[in-house]
Amino acid sequence: MHIKLANPRGFCAGVDRAIEIVNRALEVFGPPIYVRHEVVHNKFVVDDLRSRGAIFVEELDQVPDNVIVIFSAHGVSQAVRQEAARRGLKVFDATCPLVTKVHMEVARYSREGRECILIGHQGHPEVVGTMGQYDTANGGAIYLVEDEEDVARLQVRNPVSLAFVTQTTLSMDDAARMIDALRARFPGIGGPRRDDICYATQNRQDAVRQLAGECQLVLVVGSSSSSNSNRLRELAESIGVPAYLVDGAQDLRREWFDGIRRVGVTAGASAPEVLVRDVIDRLRQWGVVNVEELTGREENITFSIPKELRVVSSD
């Protein structure tokens, strides 16, 4: 059995930054550090941070006074920010800068009184946070659409003053279809010059396309709560290749590999490389004789952390 590794895979710049913010806060201020929502959607990462003193909560009413709280990489609504400010909580914001970019677009449309349509998955924390950037007090409204049927049913107040944004972790193919449907339904709709899907999501989906073209089965290392990891599995399946989403080596099943000679392995943007290596080690035990790293788009993007956390070790 032969393994091909997708490239790029695993952590993106936004995830690196979010995890570093929690780690640095623990180092500088000591535990407990409160984090609103899982800082990234990966069980291994969250369990590790929890073991070192991070406390994960879903709402600020679970956070006591006079503590440090970190907002997750997915972003939060303006109402959450206002509540934190009202209570005087010390906040470090781990929102991915590419999500913040979408937030700024939505806030601008709101200020202009322009209606906004968000393409995304209902209930996902990024979507909740993005919807919460829109202030209807200026006379506009924001709408969420998940599929083309939603677009067909959507009734807006003012189709000539309308714009769209997208969740950053969507399938590129699905987003393109949705944007086409919106433009067909509302010819005057505005939006970003390109969709808001982030560079890491695009690169990992492109890498999976290559992987699926060369392999008989694809493994995606990532948690079931991770939107971008689920999209990678769905993309491989849409190409006609069986694909499985696994949190780690413990989720592998030997029967998946009966008659399989070429296995593709990738990882979602919130999955650490150590989990990929664990999967490879397990597959070596089951007969893998060769591991090949595919070439792919190089990623050299980094995002800075808050100044207060940029401490230099005294070691």
From Swiss-Prot:
The keyword Zinc does not apply. One of its GO terms (molecular function) is 4 iron, 4 sulfur cluster binding. (2E)-4-hydroxy-3-methylbut-2-enyl diphosphate binds at H41, H74, H124, T168, S226, S227, N228, S270. Its EC number is 1.17.7.4. It catalyses: isopentenyl diphosphate + 2 oxidized [2Fe-2S]-[ferredoxin] + H2O = (2E)-4-hydroxy-3-methylbut-2-enyl diphosphate + 2 reduced [2Fe-2S]-[ferredoxin] + 2 H(+); dimethylallyl diphosphate + 2 oxidized [2Fe-2S]-[ferredoxin] + H2O = (2E)-4-hydroxy-3-methylbut-2-enyl diphosphate + 2 reduced [2Fe-2S]-[ferredoxin] + 2 H(+). The keyword Cell inner membrane does not apply. Signal peptide: none annotated. Pathway: Isoprenoid biosynthesis; dimethylallyl diphosphate biosynthesis; dimethylallyl diphosphate from (2E)-4-hydroxy-3-methylbutenyl diphosphate: step 1/1; Isoprenoid biosynthesis; isopentenyl diphosphate biosynthesis via DXP pathway; isopentenyl diphosphate from 1-deoxy-D-xylulose 5-phosphate: step 6/6. Dimethylallyl diphosphate binds at H41, H74, H124, S226, S227, N228, S270. GO terms for biological process: dimethylallyl diphosphate biosynthetic process; isopentenyl diphosphate biosynthetic process, methylerythritol 4-phosphate pathway; terpenoid biosynthetic process. Keywords: 4Fe-4S, Iron, Iron-sulfur, Isoprene biosynthesis, Metal-binding, Oxidoreductase. Its cofactor is [4Fe-4S] cluster. Isopentenyl diphosphate binds at H41, H74, H124, S226, S227, N228, S270. Belongs to the IspH family. HAMAP family: IspH (MF_00191). This is 4-hydroxy-3-methylbut-2-enyl diphosphate reductase. The lineage of its organism: Bacteria, Pseudomonadati, Pseudomonadota, Gammaproteobacteria, Pseudomonadales.
